[in-house]
Amino acid sequence: MRQRTIVCPLIQNDGAYLLCKMADDRGVFPGQWALSGGGVEPGERIEEALRREIREELGEQLLLTEITPWTFSDDIRTKTYADGRKEEIYMIYLIFDCVSANREVKINEEFQDYAWVKPEDLVHYDLNVATRKTLRLKGLL
């Protein structure tokens, strides 16, 4: 079984948290709301990976003013690829508390939508298991 280390930013701006809705046809959690993030590449430092993933998935304009390592989690997930293939992967999630100076987001093709969500509204979103676990641990659910 392949192992992946995933960096996940829990991004907050003015009391709201950034959630991204995964594309319906790919990823570990198709069609569900999640934190952004992605895999650490060989030879890449963890914070470099976090900043790269944010640029790739959320655009160059989102400005982070704080990045603080917070916690980790792990599980086994089945990833569905755009061509229909599936693969089981052991996922290690490194989760960071982040604060952004703005809400300028430009999502890439991995996502179909995004939202800045106040804690009291999080229960109304179809959150994936990993995101739900993270938000509970943070005391937001």
Swiss-Prot record:
Key words of the record: Hydrolase, Magnesium
Record-linked SUPFAM superfamilies: Nudix
GO terms, molecular function: dCTP diphosphatase activity; dTTP diphosphatase activity; dUTP diphosphatase activity; magnesium ion binding
Recorded catalytic activity of this chain's protein: a ribonucleoside 5'-triphosphate + H2O = a ribonucleoside 5'-phosphate + diphosphate + H(+); a 2'-deoxyribonucleoside 5'-triphosphate + H2O = a 2'-deoxyribonucleoside 5'-phosphate + diphosphate + H(+); dUTP + H2O = dUMP + diphosphate + H(+); dTTP + H2O = dTMP + diphosphate + H(+)
EC number(s) reported in the record: 3.6.1.9, 3.6.1.12, 3.6.1.-, 3.6.1.23
Domain of life of the source: Bacteria
One Pfam entry name: NUDIX
First-level EC class: hydrolase
InterPro entries tied to this protein: Nucleoside_triphosphatase_NudI, Nudix_hydrolase, NUDIX_hydrolase-like_dom_sf, NUDIX_hydrolase_CS, NUDIX_hydrolase_dom
Ranges for domain Nudix hydrolase: 1-141
Cofactor(s) the record lists: Mg(2+)
Motif (Nudix box): 38-59
Complex formation: Monomer.
Record family assignment: Belongs to the Nudix hydrolase family. NudI subfamily.
Its biological purpose: Catalyzes the hydrolysis of nucleoside triphosphates, with a preference for pyrimidine deoxynucleoside triphosphates (dUTP, dTTP and dCTP).
Record protein name field: Nucleoside triphosphatase NudI
Source species: Escherichia coli O1:K1 / APEC
Native organism taxonomy: Bacteria, Pseudomonadati, Pseudomonadota, Gammaproteobacteria, Enterobacterales
